[in-house]
Curated annotation (Swiss-Prot):
Cofactor note (record): Binds 2 magnesium ions per tetramer.
UniProt binding sites for Mg(2+): E261
EC number: 6.1.1.20
Xref: PROSITE patterns: AA_TRNA_LIGASE_II
Protein name (record): Phenylalanine--tRNA ligase alpha subunit
UniProt cofactor(s): Mg(2+)
Species assigned in the record: Streptococcus uberis (strain ATCC BAA-854 / 0140J)
Catalyzed reactions per annotation: tRNA(Phe) + L-phenylalanine + ATP = L-phenylalanyl-tRNA(Phe) + AMP + diphosphate + H(+)
Keywords: Aminoacyl-tRNA synthetase, ATP-binding, Cytoplasm, Ligase, Magnesium, Metal-binding, Nucleotide-binding, Protein biosynthesis
InterPro entries the UniProt entry points to: aa-tRNA-synth_II, aa-tRNA-synth_II/BPL/LPL, Phe-tRNA-synth_IIc_asu, Phe-tRNA_ligase_II_N, Phe_tRNA_ligase_alpha1_bac, Phenylalanyl-tRNA_Synthase, tRNA-bd_arm
Pfam families, sorted: Phe_tRNA-synt_N, tRNA-synt_2d
Length: 347
């Protein structure tokens, strides 16, 4: 068999082999291409026979070799495309979606229990004629402490472990700075000031079941003429009844806060045992709920308010504590862990 016949036979055999490769035969296709057209392939071996040909036959056979190479290269490229398309089609078929199957139900979101509690408390105060005022979470030491009758050398500063950013800038430890700023701007010729300031506050507490390094407070302030301790008690009684039910009672116990004088701790009659004593109230019949008092005259004077003419009261309560008492939650960390099993209980 002469060289021309061998070249023609190689072309035909290779083309027949290529057409038999269907589906995912990419490796076999590559191996075939190397065995035919590679540096040590069949076509290269045939080319070695050119040296034995006459001078007249060499250009003829050389041309035929190039034609065979071109035909086979084109055939390999086409077959590679076919094999690749077959792979893609097989993958699509294996991953096909049955459009008749029911879809996955998206979970509907709901307002967080702290958001619900905050909105309920704010609605109570709005109904009582209070205005709601927001303030800065990053605050000046001056407004957070000094304006609350806590100068830099005051021992009561040790009552609050503080996150300081600089010597004069900190994360607020209460929302009282909002009251100081509002008191500075209030025009008493238009009437008394009645405000609440809700928001996040920060303390350097170790997180456990009853403590958190961040929590939510809502603090109230009323300043006007002839404001008395009786006004404070009446306001607190109304708030507690709206939060915990009309049958609830309160009691005031003497306490100490630098920014109020006199100061009181406010207890509410236990809503589980009705005051008889149980595990919730630790057998006392009462549950501590908030702190309050008459605004210290020095706090008023620092805002330019005449403490001889005006007086006021202030109070502060924790929203997490209210929610924990109302819903029987025994671990404050549940509010912040993002566990849907916890959150879905309060839809």
């Amino acid at each position: 068999m002469d060289l021309q016949q061998q070249l023609e036979e190689l072309k035909q055999q290779t083309l027949e082999h290529l057409t038999s490769l269907t589906g995912d035969h990419s490796k076999e296709l590559q191996d075939l291409k190397v065995s035919v057209l590679g540096k040590k392939g069949t076509l290269t071996e045939l080319l070695k026979g050119l040296k034995d040909l006459s001078a007249d036959m060499r250009p003829i056979i050389g041309k035929q070799v190039n034609q065979v190479r071109d035909v086979l290269n084109t055939a390999f490229e086409e077959q590679s495309r076919i094999v690749e398309e077959a792979k893609i089609q097989a993958k699509l078929e294996s991953e096909s979606i049955d459009v008749t199957l029911p879809g996955r139900q998206m979970k509907l979101g709901n307002r967080h229990i702290l958001t619900q509690t905050s909105e309920e408390i704010e609605d109570i105060f709005l109904g009582m004629g209070f205005q709601i005022v927001d303030g800065f979470e990053v605050e000046k030491d001056y407004y957070n402490f000094e304006r609350m009758n806590l100068p830099k050398d005051h021992p009561a500063r040790d009552m609050q472990d503080t996150f300081y950013i600089t010597e004069e800038i900190l994360l607020r430890t209460h929302t009282s700075p909002v009251q100081a700023r509002t008191l500075d701007q209030h025009d008493f010729s238009k009437g008394p000031l009645k405000m609440v300031s809700p928001g996040r506050v920060f303390r350097r507490d170790t997180d456990d079941a009853t403590h958190s390094h961040q929590f939510h407070q809502i603090e109230g302030l009323v300043v006007g003429k002839n404001i008395s301790m009786g006004d404070l008690k009446g306001t607190l009684e109304m708030i507690i009844k709206k939060m915990f039910g009309e049958e609830r009672k309160i009691r005031l116990r003497p306490s100490y806060f630098p920014f109020t004088e006199p100061s009181v701790e406010v207890d509410v009659s236990c809503f589980k045992c009705g005051g008889k004593g149980c595990n919730v109230c630790k057998g006392t019949g009462w549950i501590e709920i908030l702190g309050a008092g008459m605004v210290h005259p020095r706090v008023l004077e620092m805002s330019g308010v005449n403490s001889e003419e005006y007086s006021g009261f202030a109070f502060g309560l924790g929203q997490e504590r209210i929610a924990m008492l109302r819903y029987g939650i025994n671990d404050i960390r549940g509010f912040y862990q993002g566990d849907m099993r916890f959150s879905e209980q309060f839809k």
